[in-house]
A protein has these predicted regions:
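PLP-dependent amino-acid enzyme catalytic core
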Residues: 1-182
Length: 182
């Protein structure tokens, strides 16, 4: 109505991921000082709001060496990183359903952070794509070795860090929900 102001709390609202950028700083501060110089952060990505928050923290001066856009088979952004062409498509249903996005609303924000320079985006953001079989395997593997249950989105993030962590590099992967939700 004309008397109400309506907003959204999902990742299209900058009011959500500005505060989200704070936990990137918090994570960095939790690391021992000797592990803060060479950090890789793997972010489960569907609508790319969380990755946008991390990149904003990086732009504000947080010394993150590399980000990984960890995606399920809905690989619109990984394909852009690989080819430089952004092509939306129908989403595919997966176990990591919050990442089932064929036209991520925050993609434009990411490219704008880099002045629409594909090579600059590609230099700071790597990608990893995981299918449901790989996601299930990661959940099982982490549980059997660590006794920790990953949610499907976190499993995709875990696989992204595994694919890109270099020797001597501190790696962090994010989760998005409690596994009981799934």
């Amino acid at each position: 109505t004309s008397r109400m102001t309506l907003t959204s709390a999902n990742s299209i609202n900058i009011g959500r991921f500005l505060p989200q950028s704070v936990y990137y700083f918090w994570t960095w501060a939790q690391l021992p000082p000797e592990q803060r110089d060479n950090i890789l952060i793997s972010v489960p990505s569907g609508n790319y709001g969380n990755l946008s928050a991390g990149l904003m923290a990086w732009k504000m001066g947080l010394p993150i060496r590399q980000f990984v856009a960890s995606s399920n088979v809905n690989r619109v952004v990984p394909d852009y990183l690989e080819t430089g062409k952004y092509e939306t498509r129908q989403s595919v249903r997966t176990l990591s359903n919050a990442m089932d996005v064929g036209d991520p609303s925050n993609f434009v924000r990411i490219t704008e952070l880099f002045d629409r320079d594909h090579s600059a985006v590609k230099q700071q953001v790597k990608y990893h794509v995981a299918d449901d079989s790989q996601t299930r395997h990661a959940i099982s593997q982490v549980y059997s070795h660590q006794g920790y249950i990953l949610d499907p989105h976190g499993a995709v993030g875990y696989l992204g860090y595994q694919a890109h962590q270099e020797a001597g590099q501190t790696a962090v992967f994010l989760e998005t929900a409690h596994p009981a939700k799934f």
